[in-house]
Amino acid sequence: KLKILDIGGGAGETAKKLVILGHDVTIVVPSKILSERCVENTKGKAQVHKTQFEDYQPEKGQSFDVCLFSESFQYIPAKIALEKSKTLLNKNGTILIADCFRSEEKNNSHNRRPGGGHPLSEVRALIKELNLKIISEKEITKSVAPSLDIEQQFYNMMGFAFDRIRQGLLANHPIKTKIFHFFYNIFLN
């Protein structure tokens, strides 16, 4: 039975599977809606903290066997994520990161590249600086590349269409469009 800190645990789907396997799971997620979903999905068997990882305070003396970043590492400053995780681990603990990273490859296209992530070279330098070591690494770019190509094509097509609609609305209904943008930014940012 492992004590696992699921950082940025989404709706709790991964935590649900880990709880079923018998692990002790604590979830840190910044969204009220997602934190409620985590409680539902784990049937209350995981501790759920509605906070950003940067602000998370464990119970006194609490440490973890695993700090899990499942597609969440890219949203936290890398140095903070690694330093804080290191302090939360027990003696033989592991930081597990399953996420996207930026390569050094140049993007000569005018199109936005899909995906996010910290530059891999910077993360490697931080790992060395913090005296951490990589015990396993798996490159899956080739297996996800077809999906990324589809996402890029969709983004190019829909992005162009939405931009044209926005320009038309702004030209014909500038006040309504500005009011819409104001409320959109309040509720979705």
Residue positions per predicted region:
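Conserved class I S-adenosyl-L-methionine
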Residues: 2-10
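Substrate-binding/catalytic lobe of Class I Rossmann-like enzymes that use SAM or dcSAM, i.e.
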Residues: 111-188
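A short glycine-rich, Lys/Arg-flanked "PGG" loop and its adjoining helix->strand segment in the class I
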Residues: 80-91
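A short acidic, Gly/Pro-enriched loop at the edge of an enzyme's catalytic core
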Residues: 56-67
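Class I SAM-dependent methyltransferase SAM/SAH-binding core
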Residues: 12-56
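Conserved beta-strand signature within the Rossmann-like core of class I S-adenosyl-L-methionine
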Residues: 93-100
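Short "lid" loop at the C-terminus of a central beta-strand within the Rossmann-like core
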Residues: 100-105, 139-142
